[in-house]
């Protein structure tokens, strides 16, 4: 069973010089001009299989208890290495 979902969004805006800043001599009239554009897209493909452990091993390569042990080992190594 496989399903596929695709989503995309985009936004665009233009920023121009504020006339109050120019009239108060805070910035020069030709110094401010900017354009920004943002876009985002996401695709989700899901596949399920009950007989194969490989997808689980790819998604979660290290369990949390081994992650905690590795973090503690790194912290102890740092303390011993710096001589604290």
Swiss-Prot record:
The chain crosses the membrane at residues 66-83. Keywords: Endoplasmic reticulum, Glycoprotein, Membrane, Transmembrane, Transmembrane helix. It is found in: Endoplasmic reticulum membrane. Its main location: endoplasmic reticulum. One of its GO terms (cellular component) is endoplasmic reticulum. Glycans are attached at residue 45. It is a single-pass membrane protein. Residues 34-57 are annotated as: Disordered. Residues 34-54 have a biased composition (Low complexity). The keyword Aminoacyl-tRNA synthetase does not apply. The keyword Cytoplasm does not apply. Present with 49500 molecules/cell in log phase SD medium. This is Uncharacterized endoplasmic reticulum membrane protein YMR122W-A.
């Amino acid at each position: 069973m496989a399903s596929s979902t695709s989503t995309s969004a985009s936004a665009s805006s233009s920023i121009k010089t504020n006339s109050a800043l120019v009239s108060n001599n805070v910035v020069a009239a030709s110094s401010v001009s900017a354009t920004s554009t943002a876009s985002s897209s996401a695709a989700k493909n899901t596949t399920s299989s009950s007989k194969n452990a490989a997808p689980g091993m790819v998604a979660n390569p290290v369990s949390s208890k081994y992650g905690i042990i590795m973090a503690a080992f790194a912290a102890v190594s740092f303390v011993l290495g710096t001589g604290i």
